[in-house]
């Protein structure tokens, strides 16, 4: 397994061990017992972390949220990076981490259907795992993401991947945020939040601590961003007081999408500060210019070759229409 850098765009590509993956996926599909349910701990790799009572043992029932290594990891925790070149091309070993967050011991498919207290525990697990992985100096970025719908295992789970390089999309956000800060000495995300709250027309949801918006330049139909109202560059700095508000925001937005779009497949991704290094010139203003957030993207339409080839997105909806529809969709829990 290797990481290869595109010398033109700077994008990194992971060459995974694809030969193993179809067999593993097929075995999971054909399994009579869900490996993520409570009581099936022996069917997964040994747990890395779990929220569980102090008197319970690892890899045993009784847990609330459980984290295990991926069955088919994109990156492997063992080894050194061994950065090297093949003439003009850069590559390194595919060293990183790839973890599965099993969000509940009960056989529930969608995060939106979990109780608020359980979603709060899931988010707490994200925070603890991100903070722990950032202690490893080999890793530059830690990404939390979820793909709902079409999963091999129909049991609510998400994933965490730690990479030894900063993903290209995140680097573009960091550079754009830094440029804006250089001009105005303000966080661009804080300015977006201020304007969206003033105009209201793209606001989907808000509470004391968090704001959900249909972004002005939405790439996908019903795309929603979830941001902390208070400036914060790193996700793992969330306080205990803010956790319940984030759980409510997550559940409300996901339930609205579930109801309006008839339980669509969706993805969400955490965008947060990379693992900072004490290095001259290395994003010295990031604590002031960047703002962590989640991007939630229902898969309402398929991307076309034009979009893949150009970076232009064809979106048949406007964020103003989307926000109006989602605001009007009443949910109770």
Task: Give the location of each predicted region.
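HIT superfamily nucleotide-processing domains
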Residues: 1-333
